[in-house]
Amino acid sequence: MPHRFTHTLSRRQMIGAVAGSLAVPAWAQTGTAWSAVEARARGQTVYFNAWAGSERINAYLQWAAGQIQRSFGVTLEHVKISDTAEVVKRVRAEKAAGKTDGSVDLVWINGENFLAMKRESLLFGPFAESLPSFKNVDVLGKPTTRIDFSEPVEGLEAPWGMAQLTFFADRKRVPTAPRSMAAMLDFARANPGRLTYPRPPNFHGSTFVKQALVELNPDRSALYKTVTAAALAAATVPLWSYLDALHPHLWRAGKQFPQSADAIRQMMSDGELLIALTFNPNEAANEIAAKRLSDSVYSYQLSGGTLGNTHFVAIPVNAKAKEGAQVVANFLLSPAAQARKADLAQWGDPSVLALDKLPASERALFSSTSLPGQVEQPMPAIPEPHGSWVDPLEKEWLKRYG
């Protein structure tokens, strides 16, 4: 996946945002200090609140739990969730109640949920750049490892994987894919009822809406600042006009929307829909390998780029097993764990590491083989709008179309 950035937040600007912190951060721990963290972690149980909507991800976390238990004596419990916002509410309530041994030790997070926890001082840290494995993170090539939805991370969450909005279709049904949001409207008009997107606030649905917002605004500068009512009103004029034109041509005339991208993928596989969407550029290749999609399915990204980001793990300020959580975060960043996560036979989630920083033996863990269904021509990753835009955008969408 490329990590070129375009338009308002250019690659040069993104690099500038992180270059000032390329030196070893003030909070970096010595080897002795890290050994003390590992010693205190032994025997702890880490309750990792993470989305459970994928069998592959669940299986990966089971594998990680076994490795962490054997190597570090830390028990990893996957608390399966469907909505990270609910975890944020729980941590907020526990902190307000003065509970110092909270029920959440680690949470899979990014975007608006990270922004909320950061603003409300609900996060432990900074800790991320003190992790021994952080030295291999590609902070220059993948600037979103330090900038989360235009919000500086500041060591309060550890990068875990990369994501970029990607579409896929069956070449037998869609020989030429629409490569822009304008082309998507033309495609929907030509193929009524065969296109849709998940209902916001589903993550993939909100991402589709944000992609349209970004693409339809020639001047994107306001999107990368904290949202205001005036900025929201101005920036969404072309968005609502576009969606008003698009929806009558969607599945069920835009009166109903599927609840998830998984549902859309199944409907596409069954022939009911023509195009599906994902935030994992390797998802179609995964599904082809598992015989759940035809090998005539191909993946693509829009010509002007698509939204891309990093997903992270963070430790709540009242976590009971802070040392154990740091050990887990460090393991998840290790070359062995990142390589297994990137393996299409396992999860297929792109790595946050700079492979050229690794010794040859660890670099060899990462496969360079191209498989059917992978993105043939990766496009630039466009930075996500500031996290403060998400909630008001979703609320306005629901008011208009929900």
What are these regions (language model features)?
Residues 34-42, 49, 54-75:
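Short, polar/charged alpha-helical segment
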Residues 124-137, 157, 185, 289, ...:
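Short beta-strand->loop
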Residues 251-314, 357-365:
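Extracytoplasmic/periplasmic substrate-binding proteins
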Residues 8, 25-44:
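C-terminal segment of N-terminal export signals and the immediately downstream linker at the start
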Residues 51-63, 78-86, 103-262:
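Extracytoplasmic ligand-binding site segments that recognize negatively charged/polar headgroups
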Residues 1-26:
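N-terminal secretory signal peptides
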Residues 306-307, 311-377:
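Mature extracytoplasmic/periplasmic domains
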Residues 33, 266, 371-402:
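Conserved C-terminal helix/tail region of periplasmic/extracytoplasmic solute-binding proteins
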